[in-house]
Amino acid sequence: MANQREGRASGELIESRSIDYIPDAERHGSLASQFTLWLSANLQITAIVTGALAVVLGGDVFWSLVALLLGQLIGGAVMALHGAQGPQLGLPQMISSRVQFGVYGATIPLVLVCLMYIGFSASGSVLAGAAVAQLLGVDEVAGIALFAICIVVLTILGYRTIHLIGRVGSVIGVIAFLFMFARLFSNHDLGALLANRHFSIASFLLSMSLSASWQIAFGPYVADYSRYLPRGTSSARTFLAVGLGSVMGAQAAMVFGVFAAALAGSRFAHHEVAFIVGLGSSGAVAALLYFSIAFGKLTVTTLNAYGSFMSMATIVSGFRGQRAISHRRRLVYILAMVTVSTALAIAGRHSFLKEFTAFILFLLAFFTPWSAINLVDYYCFTRSRYDVPALSDPAGRYGRWNRTAIAVYVIGILVQMPFISTSFYTGALVDRLGGTDISWILGLLVPALLYYACACASSRRIPERLILPGEAARAGE
């Protein structure tokens, strides 16, 4: 009877699971769906804008393209390593962070995760709202509000629906980008752009930071969308499906942004939606481009809303000792997260590009140390040998606060501060490096090495296997 009930749950229209463990009987999905989800999430206008920044902020076309690709590969590898944990653990990404930080301690990066995804949702809603407004003939505020309603509905429906829109969005995105590339490249001498090379280490590393931060920013929730895959799914294949989808999608969009900024200049900057739609040769094509822009933002903004509600639920459940949340509480979290991001989008819609640039680069300082700690602990020490019931027990194996991990995390943030270069904060050593921002590199390497050394010296008890809810035995005790 239990298996029948679980089997029915896996086929429900509205997802019944949230922060709790996904039993084997409810596992489903394919690696192809992972690829299309992350391809769709990256074939969108915000990635175009991010790529354009490489040129807008001083880089040439050739070296910007090289740097963006290198950053994609590094950041994409980090992101995909997180994604590969999903099928093995059957848990949301940030719940599993309690293994490293403690049941209460995981709240520290979680609060920042919530802020990040609310910010991403807000910035994406500005661009999507502009497209919806033009498509339906309403003002931008109404366009943002209508887009938010769609996000609420899709987030409530949950995992299956998110993967469905990912599959649809990948098809729409590929068709739209093929058309946009063809229109952009017609009647232009690309060879001249690529031949004009002026290498600058500062611009090169800035471009790398843009694409690496773009990919790493997915890390705190990427496993949320692979956790339903069967437990026997190959980690290597999951890594490739997630990583290739994300890197290919983001690089294609950022390449378009680089060329658009180089060819169109001021006609593109601050007028991104209008420029893209202007590539259409007729009213019908323009309408389809508006639709593709809005739908392109639909996938990733739903991911952000789903991830932010899961993060909020994880924060609250940690202090309440809950292993799951009710449908009513789930709805409250979703409405709260989307309402806040929508209000921010409406309030800040006239200063999007400048604020977004500083936002994405500065947040990287807070997530690279978390990524480093989580990945080193999982791949070097615990693998999938987690005590799932203890993740909700402050008095259990993982405790309330893991002071070692928290200290390494704080050090990982502090070591970056002298090297951060954004519009609202510039580190003391940035000028000595010619304006080069190398903070994210230190934010990965220093915490990884420090946590590895601390974990080797630790006497903590690691289970001999994955301990599931309902099991009385505790391996390793």
Predicted regions and their residues:
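Loop-to-transmembrane helix boundary motifs in multi-pass membrane proteins
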Residues: 266, 315-350, 397-416
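Hydrophobic alpha-helical segments and their helix-loop junctions in multi-pass secondary transporters
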Residues: 138, 171-197, 211-216, 256-263, ...
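Membrane-interface "cap" regions at the ends of multi-pass membrane proteins
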Residues: 1-61, 203-209, 227-237, 458-477
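Transmembrane helix-loop boundary segments of multi-pass membrane transporters
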Residues: 55-66, 130-143, 160-169, 275-281, ...
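Hydrophobic, membrane-embedded alpha-helices of multi-pass small-molecule transporters
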Residues: 31-48, 181-187, 197-260, 283-305, ...
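Transmembrane alpha-helical segments of multi-pass small-molecule transport proteins
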Residues: 110-114, 135-157, 171-182, 211-222, ...
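Helix-loop-helix connectors at the membrane interface of multi-pass transporters/channels
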Residues: 94-98, 125-142, 230, 304-335, ...
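C-terminal membrane-solvent junction of multi-pass transporters and transport-like membrane proteins
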Residues: 370-449, 464-466
